């Protein structure tokens, strides 16, 4: 489980499917308002309080995004509290919305260009050459369509990506509107040729 504060009243939690399995849950369970799902959110809120100082001291809205083989991203937003309550985790204060990403694309974000360069070296050596590269708000984003991943099993592909970056909940449309497209196609090959291959020749 990885936690990240997005702003003063919103956090992002990334759960792998192993995280769910350890708690006796499956992806499909998150579509049901079962007691063990409520317990999962209580555990997440306690962890968020401990790691980020994020206190769920009122009603919260929970958005769950399924990212294919990558896991689940949970966006928790603390909403305005109309009245005080002694029980900060009452079930009626949890508004849950689940969004299933049915598309076969993969979108990962990276903190630095070096992370993208190191990733491209790994993938190029495994005959993966495609992808689009964007930058937005100081971070880098790699978008891959399903047909660009066929050289690897998806689970293996995700495992390599996870060594260098994190799954992103941004959409390609947001990147197109607010970000800057650095490479429109064959991003892995271009990065490898420009940064890795050129460096090896020098």
Swiss-Prot record:
Q: Which GO terms describe its biological process?
A: establishment of competence for transformation; negative regulation of establishment of competence for transformation; negative regulation of sporulation resulting in formation of a cellular spore; sporulation resulting in formation of a cellular spore
Q: What UniProt keywords are attached to this protein's entry?
A: Competence, Sporulation
Drop me one GO molecular function for this one.
Answer: protein-macromolecule adaptor activity
Which InterPro entries does the entry mention?
Answer: MecA_C_sf, Neg-reg_MecA
Q: Which domain of life is it from?
A: Bacteria
Q: How does it assemble?
A: Homodimer.
Among NCBIfam families, the record links this protein to: PRK02899.1 (NF002781)
Description of its domains: The N-terminal domain has binding sites for ComK and probably for unfolded/aggregated proteins; the C-terminal domain interacts with ClpC.
* Function statement: Enables the recognition and targeting of unfolded and aggregated proteins to the ClpC protease or to other proteins involved in proteolysis. Acts negatively in the development of competence by binding ComK and recruiting it to the ClpCP protease. When overexpressed, inhibits sporulation. Also involved in Spx degradation by ClpC.
Q: Which family does it belong to?
A: Belongs to the MecA family.
Supply the name of the protein: Adapter protein MecA 2
What is the species of this protein? Answer: Bacillus anthracis
Gene encoding the protein: mecA2
């Amino acid at each position: 489980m990885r936690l990240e504060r997005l702003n003063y009243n919103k956090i992002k939690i990334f759960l792998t499917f192993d995280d769910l399995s350890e708690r006796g849950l499956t992806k499909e369970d998150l579509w049901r308002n079962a007691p063990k799902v409520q317990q999962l959110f209580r555990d997440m809120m306690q962890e968020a309080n401990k790691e980020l100082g994020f206190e769920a001291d009122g009603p919260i809205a929970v958005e769950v995004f399924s990212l294919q083989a990558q896991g689940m991203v949970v966006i928790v937003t603390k909403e305005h509290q109309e009245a005080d309550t002694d029980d900060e985790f009452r079930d009626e204060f949890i508004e849950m919305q689940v969004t299933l990403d049915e598309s076969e694309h993969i979108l990962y974000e990276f903190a630095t260009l070096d992370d993208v360069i190191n990733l491209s070296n790994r993938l190029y050596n495994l005959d993966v050459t495609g992808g689009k590269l964007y930058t937005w708000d100081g971070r880098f984003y790699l978008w891959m369509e399903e047909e660009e991943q066929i050289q690897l099993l998806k689970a293996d592909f995700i495992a390599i990506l996870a060594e260098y970056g994190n799954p992103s909940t941004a959409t390609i449309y947001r990147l197109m509107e607010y970000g800057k497209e650095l490479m429109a196609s064959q991003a892995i090959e271009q990065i490898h040729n420009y940064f890795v291959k050129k460096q090896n020749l020098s």
